[in-house]
Amino acid sequence: MFFEFGCCYLLSYRVVQLVVLCLEEFLGEFAIMFHMNKQAKNTVCLWYEKDAQAAAEFYAATFPDSKVGAIFQAPSDFPGGKEGDVLTVEFTVCGVPCFGLNGGPFFKQSEAFSFQIATDNQEETDRYWNAIVGNGGQESACGWCKDRWGVSWQITPRVLTDALAAGGAEAKRAFDAMMTMQKIDVAAIEAARRG
Protein backbone atom coordinates (compact mmCIF):
# COMPACT_ATOMS: atom_id res chain seq x y z
CA MET A 1 0.00 0.00 0.00
CA PHE A 2 2.74 2.49 0.99
CA PHE A 3 4.77 1.55 -2.08
CA GLU A 4 1.76 2.15 -4.36
CA PHE A 5 1.05 5.51 -2.69
CA GLY A 6 4.72 6.53 -3.02
CA CYS A 7 4.78 5.59 -6.71
CA CYS A 8 1.56 7.53 -7.37
CA TYR A 9 2.97 10.57 -5.54
CA LEU A 10 6.24 10.41 -7.49
CA LEU A 11 4.34 10.00 -10.76
CA SER A 12 2.09 12.98 -9.91
CA TYR A 13 5.14 15.10 -9.07
CA ARG A 14 6.77 14.18 -12.39
CA VAL A 15 3.56 15.02 -14.28
CA VAL A 16 3.46 18.46 -12.60
CA GLN A 17 7.12 19.02 -13.55
CA LEU A 18 6.34 18.04 -17.15
CA VAL A 19 3.34 20.41 -17.26
CA VAL A 20 5.50 23.28 -15.95
CA LEU A 21 8.18 22.54 -18.57
CA CYS A 22 5.54 22.46 -21.33
CA LEU A 23 4.06 25.75 -20.13
CA GLU A 24 7.49 27.34 -20.03
CA GLU A 25 8.15 26.14 -23.58
CA PHE A 26 4.72 27.28 -24.79
CA LEU A 27 4.55 30.63 -23.00
CA GLY A 28 8.28 31.36 -23.10
CA GLU A 29 9.90 33.86 -20.76
CA PHE A 30 6.58 34.95 -19.23
CA ALA A 31 5.97 31.48 -17.81
CA ILE A 32 9.50 31.27 -16.45
CA MET A 33 9.25 34.64 -14.71
CA PHE A 34 5.72 33.89 -13.47
CA HIS A 35 6.92 30.60 -12.02
CA MET A 36 9.99 32.28 -10.45
CA ASN A 37 8.01 35.14 -8.93
CA LYS A 38 5.45 32.77 -7.44
CA GLN A 39 8.34 31.00 -5.69
CA ALA A 40 10.31 34.04 -4.49
CA LYS A 41 9.57 35.36 -1.02
CA ASN A 42 12.40 37.88 -1.17
CA THR A 43 13.23 40.09 -4.14
CA VAL A 44 16.01 42.68 -4.39
CA CYS A 45 14.56 46.08 -5.35
CA LEU A 46 16.98 48.47 -7.07
CA TRP A 47 16.16 52.15 -7.57
CA TYR A 48 17.20 53.57 -10.95
CA GLU A 49 16.77 57.11 -12.14
CA LYS A 50 15.22 56.04 -15.46
CA ASP A 51 17.10 53.12 -17.01
CA ALA A 52 15.89 50.00 -15.15
CA GLN A 53 15.08 48.23 -18.41
CA ALA A 54 18.49 48.95 -19.97
CA ALA A 55 20.22 47.77 -16.79
CA ALA A 56 18.16 44.57 -16.65
CA GLU A 57 18.89 43.83 -20.32
CA PHE A 58 22.62 44.38 -19.72
CA TYR A 59 22.64 42.04 -16.70
CA ALA A 60 20.71 39.37 -18.63
CA ALA A 61 23.21 39.56 -21.50
CA THR A 62 26.24 39.51 -19.18
CA PHE A 63 25.58 36.94 -16.45
CA PRO A 64 24.44 33.30 -16.60
CA ASP A 65 21.04 32.34 -15.19
CA SER A 66 19.89 35.94 -15.73
CA LYS A 67 16.87 37.16 -17.67
CA VAL A 68 14.42 40.02 -18.06
CA GLY A 69 10.84 39.33 -16.99
CA ALA A 70 7.75 41.49 -16.82
CA ILE A 71 8.04 45.15 -17.77
CA PHE A 72 5.34 47.41 -16.34
CA GLN A 73 4.48 50.69 -18.08
CA ALA A 74 2.51 53.65 -16.76
CA PRO A 75 -1.15 53.27 -17.78
CA SER A 76 -1.58 57.07 -17.88
CA ASP A 77 0.32 60.33 -17.45
CA PHE A 78 1.57 61.04 -13.92
CA PRO A 79 3.53 63.87 -12.21
CA GLY A 80 6.92 62.32 -13.00
CA GLY A 81 6.23 61.03 -16.49
CA LYS A 82 3.80 60.05 -19.18
CA GLU A 83 1.69 57.14 -20.29
CA GLY A 84 3.84 54.28 -21.57
CA ASP A 85 6.94 55.14 -19.54
CA VAL A 86 8.59 52.07 -18.02
CA LEU A 87 7.91 52.09 -14.27
CA THR A 88 9.31 48.73 -13.14
CA VAL A 89 11.17 45.76 -14.57
CA GLU A 90 11.36 42.26 -13.12
CA PHE A 91 14.64 40.45 -13.78
CA THR A 92 17.05 37.90 -12.36
CA VAL A 93 20.81 38.18 -11.88
CA CYS A 94 22.54 34.80 -11.50
CA GLY A 95 19.26 33.34 -10.27
CA VAL A 96 18.55 36.14 -7.77
CA PRO A 97 15.12 37.72 -8.33
CA CYS A 98 15.30 41.50 -8.70
CA PHE A 99 12.92 44.37 -9.31
CA GLY A 100 14.12 47.56 -11.01
CA LEU A 101 12.21 50.73 -10.17
CA ASN A 102 12.48 53.88 -12.30
CA GLY A 103 12.02 56.30 -9.42
CA GLY A 104 13.77 59.45 -10.56
CA PRO A 105 16.91 61.18 -9.27
CA PHE A 106 16.02 61.14 -5.57
CA PHE A 107 18.05 58.14 -4.34
CA LYS A 108 21.47 57.09 -5.62
CA GLN A 109 23.12 53.68 -5.59
CA SER A 110 25.99 53.17 -3.15
CA GLU A 111 28.48 50.55 -2.05
CA ALA A 112 26.17 49.80 0.89
CA PHE A 113 24.62 47.25 -1.50
CA SER A 114 26.54 45.14 -3.98
CA PHE A 115 26.21 41.95 -5.99
CA GLN A 116 29.05 39.51 -5.29
CA ILE A 117 29.76 37.28 -8.28
CA ALA A 118 31.93 34.22 -7.61
CA THR A 119 34.22 33.28 -10.49
CA ASP A 120 36.16 30.09 -11.17
CA ASN A 121 39.16 31.46 -13.09
CA GLN A 122 40.82 34.55 -14.54
CA GLU A 123 38.95 34.32 -17.85
CA GLU A 124 35.58 34.48 -16.10
CA THR A 125 36.80 37.26 -13.80
CA ASP A 126 38.03 39.27 -16.79
CA ARG A 127 34.82 38.70 -18.75
CA TYR A 128 32.52 40.12 -16.04
CA TRP A 129 34.90 42.88 -14.99
CA ASN A 130 35.48 44.05 -18.56
CA ALA A 131 31.75 43.91 -19.37
CA ILE A 132 30.89 46.13 -16.39
CA VAL A 133 33.81 48.57 -16.56
CA GLY A 134 33.89 48.62 -20.38
CA ASN A 135 30.21 49.56 -20.58
CA GLY A 136 30.54 52.92 -18.84
CA GLY A 137 31.38 51.49 -15.42
CA GLN A 138 34.12 52.37 -12.99
CA GLU A 139 36.96 50.39 -11.37
CA SER A 140 37.42 50.39 -7.63
CA ALA A 141 39.66 48.45 -5.23
CA CYS A 142 39.82 44.81 -4.08
CA GLY A 143 37.67 43.35 -6.85
CA TRP A 144 34.93 45.99 -6.62
CA CYS A 145 33.56 47.95 -9.57
CA LYS A 146 30.42 49.91 -10.45
CA ASP A 147 28.26 49.62 -13.52
CA ARG A 148 27.15 52.70 -15.45
CA TRP A 149 23.97 52.90 -13.32
CA GLY A 150 26.00 53.07 -10.11
CA VAL A 151 25.27 49.51 -8.90
CA SER A 152 28.31 48.01 -7.15
CA TRP A 153 29.70 44.59 -8.03
CA GLN A 154 32.31 42.42 -6.34
CA ILE A 155 33.89 40.13 -8.93
CA THR A 156 35.45 37.59 -6.59
CA PRO A 157 37.45 34.55 -7.71
CA ARG A 158 36.81 31.50 -5.52
CA VAL A 159 40.56 31.14 -5.01
CA LEU A 160 40.47 34.41 -3.05
CA THR A 161 37.56 33.42 -0.82
CA ASP A 162 39.16 30.00 -0.24
CA ALA A 163 42.45 31.65 0.75
CA LEU A 164 40.76 34.07 3.14
CA ALA A 165 38.75 31.22 4.68
CA ALA A 166 41.94 29.21 5.28
CA GLY A 167 43.02 31.65 7.98
CA GLY A 168 46.52 32.10 9.33
CA ALA A 169 49.51 33.13 7.24
CA GLU A 170 47.90 32.02 3.98
CA ALA A 171 44.91 34.31 4.53
CA LYS A 172 47.19 37.22 5.49
CA ARG A 173 49.29 36.85 2.34
CA ALA A 174 46.19 36.62 0.13
CA PHE A 175 44.59 39.60 1.89
CA ASP A 176 47.74 41.72 1.53
CA ALA A 177 47.93 40.85 -2.19
CA MET A 178 44.22 41.67 -2.69
CA MET A 179 44.68 45.08 -1.07
CA THR A 180 47.03 46.10 -3.92
CA MET A 181 44.58 45.16 -6.69
CA GLN A 182 41.62 46.61 -8.52
CA LYS A 183 40.53 43.61 -10.61
CA ILE A 184 41.61 40.43 -8.81
CA ASP A 185 44.64 38.69 -10.34
CA VAL A 186 44.07 34.96 -9.80
CA ALA A 187 47.71 33.98 -10.43
CA ALA A 188 48.94 36.58 -7.91
CA ILE A 189 46.48 35.31 -5.28
CA GLU A 190 47.58 31.72 -5.91
CA ALA A 191 51.24 32.76 -5.56
CA ALA A 192 50.44 34.60 -2.32
CA ARG A 193 48.71 31.49 -0.96
CA ARG A 194 51.83 29.43 -1.59
CA GLY A 195 54.03 32.05 0.05
Q: Where is each model-derived feature located?
A:
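Cysteine-centered motifs
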Residues: 7-8, 22
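Short, Lys/Arg-enriched N-terminal segments with co-localized hydrophobic residues
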Residues: 21-35
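Short, flexible turn/loop "capping" segments at secondary-structure junctions
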Residues: 34-40, 107-109
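Core segments of cupin and vicinal oxygen chelate
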Residues: 45-95
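Vicinal oxygen chelate
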Residues: 48, 52, 61-62, 93-97, ...
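C-terminal cap/linker of serine protease catalytic domains
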Residues: 169-195
